[in-house]
From Swiss-Prot:
Group of enzyme by EC: hydrolase
Annotated cofactor note: Binds 1 zinc ion.
Residues the entry annotates as binding Zn(2+): 102, 129, 132
HAMAP family for this protein: Cyt_deam
A Pfam family of this chain: dCMP_cyt_deam_2
Full protein name: Cytidine deaminase
PANTHER family on file: CYTIDINE DEAMINASE
UniProt gene name: cdd
Cofactor(s) required for function per UniProt: Zn(2+)
Superkingdom of the organism of origin: Bacteria
Lineage start: Bacteria, Pseudomonadati, Pseudomonadota, Gammaproteobacteria, Vibrionales
Active site: 104
InterPro entries (alphabetical): APOBEC/CMP_deaminase_Zn-bd, CMP_dCMP_dom, Cyd/dCyd_deaminase_Zn-bd, Cyt/Deoxycyt_deaminase, Cyt_deam_dimer, Cytidine_deaminase-like, Cytidine_deaminase_bacteria
Keywords: Hydrolase, Metal-binding, Zinc
Length: 295
């Protein structure tokens, strides 16, 4: 059990402590809250919508993996379906800092990989850094997205990022989280490669055309996938490995359980994720084999 979940329960509002315990300690809890669960918590707590989301932030931050900074950040996004998705910052000891994932990126990619096509709002412990503001500006819902911080009035993303630069400035009309199927195929039948290819076909890479996907197989048999999330400003792009690692951590698993990995990408893309994927996985465990396929 995640001990920080237990600590979050201890400090949760008394009126919803029992209900929250039933939800977050359930064996099938996947770091999400359904619209019905959130409505029940609203009714039981007597809190306003934004107040409840802020009260839930410690549960999102409980998923933080921060061996470098010991700085735990949580984020909660609400998908267009009404489901709430937790996210938290992720750091990789031994890898360069550019491999770090911010809490906002974590929650957004969590929602994306679970099928959401946009988010309506995001709630965060701390004011989003410029990197994350730019990352969020790539979203399908960037123009309407609302940002909620503790003890602050809700503001729009565009208020946090005035005169913003985004996909439209580069002639791109499809934002991150657009439902896509690039329909690439391969004759390779290895399950972990097939899973990585499925992630590739969902990826957002309009600038380099390097559609790519990663899959991670655990010793217990579970497989987690990540699709590449490219950004108009380039540097805030989120590699497919990091997206997969986020899904793994939010499902309650550890890096030590990774047994195999696969990266599939487009051969004619103008960049490659191979070197960074290999070096980052080597920082986690140099014995993880990586299957690579360029199609």
């Amino acid at each position: 059990m995640n001990s920080r979940i237990t600590l979050a329960l201890e400090s949760a509002p008394t009126a919803i402590k029992a209900l929250l315990s039933d939800i977050v300690l359930a064996d099938n809890f996947d770091a999400t809250l359904s619209p019905e669960q959130f409505a029940s918590l609203l009714q039981a707590s007597g809190l306003a919508d934004d107040e409840l989301r802020i009260a839930l932030l410690p549960f999102a931050a409980a998923y933080s993996y921060a061996p470098l900074s010991d700085f735990y950040v949580g984020a909660i996004v609400r998908g267009l379906s009404g489901t709430l998705y937790f996210g938290a910052n992720l750091e990789i000891a031994g890898a360069q800092l550019g491999q770090t994932v911010h809490a906002e990126q974590s929650a957004i990619s969590h929602a994306w990989m679970k099928g959401e096509q946009g988010i309506s709002d995001i709630t965060i412990n701390f004011s989003p850094c410029g990197h994350c503001r730019q990352f969020m500006n790539e979203l399908t819902t960037a123009k309407e997205l609302k940002v909620q911080l503790p003890q602050r009035d809700e503001m729009s993303l565009q208020e946090y990022l005035p005169d913003s630069f985004g996909p439209a400035d580069l002639g791109v009309t499809t934002g991150l989280m657009t439902k896509l199927d690039h329909k690439h195929t391969t004759e390779e039948t290895t399950p972990i490669v097939v899973e990585a290819l499925a992630a590739l076909n969902r990826s957002h890479a309009p600038y380099t055309k390097n559609l790519s996907g990663v899959s991670l197989q655990l010793t217990s048999g579970e497989v987690f996938t990540g699709a590449y999330a490219e950004n108009a400003a380039f540097n805030p792009s989120l590699p497919p490995l990091q997206v997969a690692l986020i899904q793994l951590k939010l499902a309650g698993f550890d890096f030590e359980q990774i047994e195999n990995a696969a990266l599939v990408e487009i051969a004619e893309g103008s960049i490659s994720h191979l070197a960074d994927t290999q070096s980052t996985l080597e920082a986690i465990n140099p014995d993880i084999p990586v299957t690579y396929l360029a199609i």
